[in-house]
Amino acid sequence: MTKPNPNKQTVELNRTSLYWGLLLIFVLAILFSSYIFN
């Protein structure tokens, strides 16, 4: 009964890392588009 807890933590960590990755790509896309249009 103690094993599901670390698994939940790893899943939450993967979700947060995925969100940070999408946010980073979004920011880079904005910077790249602003660099092109300027």
Swiss-Prot record:
Topology within the bilayer: Single-pass membrane protein
Compartment(s) of residence: Plastid, Chloroplast thylakoid membrane
Keywords: Chloroplast, Membrane, Photosynthesis, Photosystem II, Plastid, Reaction center, Thylakoid, Transmembrane, Transmembrane helix
This protein's record includes keyword Chaperone: no
Chief localization: plastid
Any single biological process term in GO: photosynthesis
InterPro entries associated with the record: PSII_PsbL (IPR003372), PSII_PsbL_sf (IPR037266)
Pfam family for this entry, one: PsbL
GO CC, alphabetical: chloroplast thylakoid membrane; photosystem II reaction center
Membrane spanning stretches: 17-37
Family: Belongs to the PsbL family.
Alphabetized HAMAP family for the sequence: PSII_PsbL
Described function: One of the components of the core complex of photosystem II (PSII). PSII is a light-driven water:plastoquinone oxidoreductase that uses light energy to abstract electrons from H(2)O, generating O(2) and a proton gradient subsequently used for ATP formation. It consists of a core antenna complex that captures photons, and an electron transfer chain that converts photonic excitation into a charge separation. This subunit is found at the monomer-monomer interface and is required for correct PSII assembly and/or dimerization.
Subunit details: PSII is composed of 1 copy each of membrane proteins PsbA, PsbB, PsbC, PsbD, PsbE, PsbF, PsbH, PsbI, PsbJ, PsbK, PsbL, PsbM, PsbT, PsbX, PsbY, PsbZ, Psb30/Ycf12, at least 3 peripheral proteins of the oxygen-evolving complex and a large number of cofactors. It forms dimeric complexes.
Protein name as catalogued: Photosystem II reaction center protein L
Species of provenance: Nephroselmis olivacea
